[in-house]
C-alpha cells in the first residue's frame, strides 16, 4: 500500500474500520485505555465540518433547503437524523454529501497525523475507510468482524429503526468479504470480546 506523500513513513497509523454497528467505538475505547494513544475519529470530524456558520453548513443548507435545519436547536444546527435518513434513501444526495465531506475529512486527518508526528502510534477510526479510499493514510488496516444478524440488531436498537431499514443501511456498505481482502488484521467481535482483546494485546 502506498502511503500519502504528506505523511511520515515511520509513524504507525492503524486504520480501524468495519460495518455500521459492528463495534468499532467499543474497540477504539479499549485500545485507548490499553495503550493510551491518540484517536482520530472521522465521524467526529464529519460532525465538526457541518457546525453552524461553517462553509460546509452553508452548502448543506443551500443544497437540502431550510428543512434540514433542526427546528428545536437554539443554534440552528443541522438535523443530523434527518440528514442521515435522506442520504441513506437517496443515492444522488448521498454521493453529493460524500463528495463534499470526504476530501475535507481526509485533509483533517492528515493534518492531525502531522500534529501528532512525535507519537509512534495513532489510531484512525474510519467507518468508510475502503469506500472513501482512505487507505493511503494508514500503515495498516484493522477490520472489525461482526455477524450480520448481531450487526442488524445493534443498528435497530441504536437508531430505533425497523429491520428492513437496518438491512438497507447495511447493504449500502461494502460487504465484509470484499473488505477483508485488503485488511491486515481481523478483529472478531462476535460474542466473545476476549477474542479481539487478545488479538490487540499481541499487536500493540
Curated annotation (Swiss-Prot):
Q: Which residues form a coiled coil?
A: none
The Enzyme Commission number assigned here is: 2.7.1.24
Q: Name one GO molecular function term.
A: dephospho-CoA kinase activity
The answer on whether this UniProt entry bears the keyword Lipid biosynthesis reads: no
To which pathway does this protein belong?
Cofactor biosynthesis; coenzyme A biosynthesis; CoA from (R)-pantothenate: step 5/5
Q: Name one Pfam family in it.
A: CoaE
From the UniProt record, list the reaction(s) this protein catalyses.
Answer: 3'-dephospho-CoA + ATP = ADP + CoA + H(+)
GO BP annotations, alphabetical order: coenzyme A biosynthetic process
Indicate yes or no for the key word ATP-binding.
Answer: yes
PROSITE patterns assigned to the protein according to its UniProt record, in alphabetical order = DPCK (PS51219)
Q: In the UniProt record, which is one GO cellular component term? A: cytoplasm
Cited SUPFAM superfamilies = P-loop containing nucleoside triphosphate hydrolases (SSF52540)
- Which residue numbers delimit the DPCK domain? 13-204
For the ligand (ATP), the binding residues are 21-26
Which keywords annotate this record? ATP-binding, Coenzyme A biosynthesis, Cytoplasm, Kinase, Nucleotide-binding, Transferase
Q: Where in the cell is it found?
A: Cytoplasm
Name the enzyme's class. Answer: transferase
Family the entry assigns: Belongs to the CoaE family.
The free-text function statement in the UniProt record for this protein reads: Catalyzes the phosphorylation of the 3'-hydroxyl group of dephosphocoenzyme A to form coenzyme A.
Matching entries from HAMAP family are given as: Dephospho_CoA_kinase
Entry protein name: Dephospho-CoA kinase
